[in-house]
Amino acid sequence: YAGEIPQWDVSLVRPAGARLKTFGGRASGPDPLVDLFKFTIEKFKGAVGRRLSSIECHDLMCKIGEIVVVGGVRRSALISLSNLSDDRMRHAKSGEWYDEPDKNIYRFGYRSLANNSVAYTEKPDAMSFLREWTSLAESGSGERGIFNRQAATKQAAKNGRRDPNYEWGCNPCSEILLRGPKIDKNGQPVTGTGGQFCNLSEVIIRATDTKKDLLRKVRLATILGTIQST
């Protein structure tokens, strides 16, 4: 970060309340986008002379997710997989993370946009697992959850149809594996960050749709979701 703050122009963004003809609903206007820009600037200013911490990167992603809204409908889902040793992420949703009662301030509400899980790369010892489980129970939010990369690799190799030599992650609900970077024989990533689509797909219902139209849309959405997930 060089200390330079770019300027932005949101004059061409649809005004708040403008009707969305294709999707339906109303536009959110430029204010959420401006709020994101200001939030990002403050995060970078607070990290002058150092790298962003894991929780700062997490918060930036959550804030982006918060403003991804179309027609008043949330259009984002997130998951953060963190190291066992990352205490910041362990407590990202612990206690009264969502507000500050004495000041009536909504502090970290954007963190509700993401599910958080620890990513085990090997079987933990009993005490480490117990500490993590205790933290989950005491958080009041049921997080961080637990994701096991070893188990994910075994699951990917199970039917023999997929190359298991990747660093596996999952979609935000953790019901499907998503491929990350390819790894070498020493377990080190040898490609970029990887990336794969989630299996979730959505059907938009229009006032003019018939039953036949809806059945066709559901069929196509099912096919698309299957392709995305494989």
Q: What residue ranges belong to the model's regions?
A:
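Flexible, glycine/charged-enriched surface loops at secondary-structure junctions
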Residues: 4-7, 47-59, 71-81, 229-230
